[in-house]
Amino acid sequence: MQNEIKKVCVIGAGVMGSGIAALIANSSHRVVLLDILDKDSNDPNKIVKNAVKNLHRQKLPPLSYPDKVNFITIGNLEHDLDLIKECNLVIEVIVEKLDIKHQLYNKIIPYLKEDTIIASNTSTLPLKKLKENLPNNIKSRFIITHFFNPPRYMELVELIIDNTIKDEVIEKISVFLTKILGKTIIKCNDTPGFIANRVGCFLLELVAHKAIAQNLDFVTIDQIFSRCLGLPNTGIFGLYDLIGHDVMKLISSSLLSALPKSDDYHRIYFNTKVFDKMIEHNLIGRKGEGGFYRLSVSNGKKIKEVINISDLSYHPVQKVDISFNNLDELLASDSIYSKFFSEIITEFYIYLTSLVPSVTNNIYDIDATMKLGYSWHYGPFELLTIAVKNGWNSIIKNADLMNISLPKYLASKEYQKIDKQKFNSKKDFLQESTIVLANDSANLIHYCENLIFVITTKMNTLNHNVFYLLQEAVSKAENYGKNLYIFPQGNNFSAGADLKLILSYIQDGNFDNLENLLKLGQQTMRYLKYSSVHIISCARGVALGGGCELLLNSSYIVANQELNAGLIEFGVGLIPGWSGVTEMFARSNGDKTKLIRNIKNIIEQNKTSSADYFKADYDVSNMQVNMNKHYILDEALKLNVSNKIVSIPHKIALPKINIVSEIDTSKYNDLQNKVLNKFQNIIDKHNEISEAELLTYEREIFLELAKEPQTIEKLHAIVG
């Protein structure tokens, strides 16, 4: 595409601004990060420098790999405005005050190229107000891109445009957000709070205010929301703490100032004395001294506590016995929470449906927003349509009992037109393909003239049938002279071995069958590695244990940036048994530093936090990283790979080292030290070693560890 976005300027180096800059850097695009001049320091860029340093300190790292910081150029708004001239996109992420934003826009306009897009990351201010004083040639390329925090990990971006925006601007920003940054765009109308804040914050305030007024238990309410309505474990009050009470007050105040008095947000946002008192005592949530919940430490143990609203004291969270498993059971019960939730759900859906079509005329976008932005299992329309019996009729009946007027959407029964199929908006390529081979654990399919291997077990775990069919698939691909693609069913590449199967062999003392499974897996990995056609793995989510071994034996990997991969078998007291150990030795090939690192990968269960870390830590050179997990198959099919030059197994050089002297083993347990000694014996016995010999050692060590009580205990803990 011509005139694509190659360089971005982010203005505002707070948590959100620096997070967006890091996200752009993760995509290997150049980004300029600017903020105001620090007049109290000799260093004019102190504010931005501190923000960039903080990128390396956060619990959820904004950077996918430390050296991605090199894509960030820093500066200030007094000396470095010329840097904006190089940028195709400017994202403003400053304080939510209209006059200050207007001052900034006027300041940067002289430095903009004629086609540079300007985007505000506001979550509260309307697009119309932001651009009201701008020249027409700027208005036509001024938009809102509302990222969610933390930007690296949250998939959703709300995009707000109007009819003055040029089509090429919409196309350019859409491609950048989806293909380059890996986001899912939801287009919203220019209304207060857009979709996410208008819907989500209404529910948070509705529940919090009603629960406090009725003196109900926060823990019970949160658990009901999680179990019966599909909200994350944070529930309502945990999420309120996560967002921050001070931030919630700012959002709600902004919404109230923008919404007409007739809007129900005014009605439900009443008596804020408790909230104000909590803010006054710095009980603003996780970033304060507590919130509705807090974590305290007693005798070295963390204890979750819940607040007593009457005096702002805290007491330990007690286990709550909830007798209902879904919304139907809850609403049919005689619990005080049945009446509470009946009223909450009715008021919420009355408000929600009143927003159609003013906020958006697409109810599926509302659902997608709540699932992506708030991590709900169901979207609100999906919940009432699919997961609740007679859900819409119940809302209408309750509204009548509560003397609440129905919005047009409900009164005209628009909900009867809902297409249930649209709730699953992701394209299922399996519906457009032909099955070539299949068993109860995997399929080989023909899709767009390509052969694709799809594992169909839970979490794509590996067992005999997966390996049998994969070997057949490799043979079929070789016969056709076609590359073979391994693509995950669902969001994860593979969680590794079927541990339930392995534990059953151990418990039955059936170590011959266990060894046969190891041999089968090793043989399959050799099929992949030495195939005459390319094996191209499309990896997203997790690729752990055996899943990681599949990647290590592939010709090419197309991986989503957020891939979590690694040889983590030691977590259950085992070692990689399907060539993982052999691959770690082979990739070292005589290099002492690499061998030490690779041994630590195994012993310390190195589960990488990104594809970039996997590439570096596991010495993976044949990998393309893609920011959007939904496009990895498309990108894999586009790979222009030459005919494969088939390699043959070769001897692997082993450096003469003393492993214990090279690794800090002070925190290792007996099992870890035992395996280190096994590896040391291999190194001591051989100057060089064949893959076949290493595979034999691998099986022997695995089988020995499988008999250890610690291993059996760990397996039981995982399998249950």
Curated annotation (Swiss-Prot):
Residues 1-384 are annotated as: 3-hydroxyacyl-CoA dehydrogenase. One of its GO terms (biological process) is fatty acid metabolic process. In the N-terminal section; belongs to the 3-hydroxyacyl-CoA dehydrogenase family. In the C-terminal section; belongs to the enoyl-CoA hydratase/isomerase family. Keywords: Fatty acid metabolism, Isomerase, Lipid metabolism, Lyase, Multifunctional enzyme, NAD, Oxidoreductase. This is Putative fatty acid oxidation complex trifunctional enzyme. It comes from the Bacteria. One of its GO terms (molecular function) is enoyl-CoA hydratase activity. Residues 453-720 are annotated as: Enoyl-CoA hydratase/isomerase. InterPro entries: 3-OHacyl-CoA_DH_NAD-bd, 3HC_DH_C, 6-PGluconate_DH-like_C_sf, ClpP/crotonase-like_dom_sf, ECH_dom, NAD(P)-bd_dom_sf. The keyword Lipid metabolism applies. It catalyses: a (3S)-3-hydroxyacyl-CoA + NAD(+) = a 3-oxoacyl-CoA + NADH + H(+); a (3S)-3-hydroxyacyl-CoA = a (2E)-enoyl-CoA + H2O; a 4-saturated-(3S)-3-hydroxyacyl-CoA = a (3E)-enoyl-CoA + H2O; a (3Z)-enoyl-CoA = a 4-saturated (2E)-enoyl-CoA. Its EC number is 1.1.1.35, 4.2.1.17, 5.3.3.8.
